[in-house]
Swiss-Prot record:
GO terms for molecular function: 3-oxoacyl-[acyl-carrier-protein] reductase (NADPH) activity; metal ion binding; NAD binding. Ca(2+) 1 binds at residues 50, 53. The lineage of its organism: Bacteria, Pseudomonadati, Pseudomonadota, Gammaproteobacteria, Enterobacterales. The gene is fabG. This is 3-oxoacyl-[acyl-carrier-protein] reductase FabG. Ca(2+) 3 binds at residues 233-234. It catalyses: a (3R)-hydroxyacyl-[ACP] + NADP(+) = a 3-oxoacyl-[ACP] + NADPH + H(+). Calcium ions stabilize the structure, and may inhibit FabG activity by obstructing access to the active site. It comes from Buchnera aphidicola subsp. Schizaphis graminum (strain Sg).
Length: 244
């Protein structure tokens, strides 16, 4: 089955890495459905996808919303072949100061939503005996980071989830993998001062930060036929910041 005849769903597709992934998928001839939490975000998705797909509002903190919206997608006869769990948030704080809400929101969006999104598409993938599930992890899920207990826990949790799901559907033509970025160019990194920037850079053997395009390239590969024998894996894209 050729990738260009597929339909992909990308969460958090209105900006940054999600937008880059969605654009690259659409350039491959894939119909892309992108999610955002705002009306303006949906407009952005519709604008850059044009005839190659569309956007819709989805609140990943709300499990009822996920189930309802995904049911709507299925009723419109869209069968998801490729699921990209890209959306994620941070809410940094030391454990002694971290509120329940800061913990719960990060876990809900970064980990729990991946469970619900994957569950919402897995039956149709099994029926077709074809599917690609690719989730954006983080080097922090392996290294940990001071002030990011919630974020680190959410990204670490993805590892066990994907390995287990990969085992469950390995004989069904479905692959389940993670792309784990290191330090990449985002709107957040633009606000770092010189000291902070150099501190991050000192941890990277390649002595440069990565780009959204480099992360997206790994996602596109895992979504393709060329990666049909790869499952339950984490592809690290971090310039040598973390090596397995």
């Amino acid at each position: 089955m050729k990738i260009e005849k597929k339909t992909a769903l990308v969460t958090g597709a209105n900006q940054g890495l999600g937008k880059e992934i969605a654009i690259k998928l659409s350039q491959k001839g894939i119909q892309v459905i992108g999610t955002s939490t705002t009306v303006d975000g949906v407009k952005t998705i519709n604008k850059y996808l044009k005839k190659n797909g569309f956007g819709f509002i989805l609140d990943l903190k709300d499990t009822d919303s996920i189930l309802e919206k995904m049911k709507e997608i299925c009723q419109k006869k869209y069968s998801i072949d490729i699921l990209i769990n890209n959306a994620g948030i941070t809410s940094d704080n030391l454990l002694v100061y971290m509120s329940n809400k800061e913990w719960e929101n990060v876990i809900k969006i970064n980990l729990t939503s991946v469970f619900y999104m994957s569950k919402s598409v897995i039956r149709s993938m099994i029926k077709k005996r074809y599917g690609r599930i690719v989730t954006i992890g983080s080097v922090i899920g392996y290294l940990g980071n001071r002030g990011q207990i919630n974020y680190s826990a959410s990204k670490s949790g993805l590892i066990g989830f994907h390995k287990s799901l990969a085992l469950e559907v390995a004989q069904k033509g479905i692959t389940v993998n993670i792309v784990s970025p290191g330090f990449i160019k985002t709107n957040l990194t633009k606000n770092l001062n010189v000291f902070q920037y150099k501190k991050h850079l000192s941890k990277i053997p390649m002595k440069r930060i990565g780009t959204a395009e480099e992360i997206a390239n790994a996602v596109i590969f895992l979504s393709s036929e060329k990666a049909s024998y790869i499952t339950g894996q984490t592809i690290h894209v971090n310039g040598g910041m973390y090596m397995t």
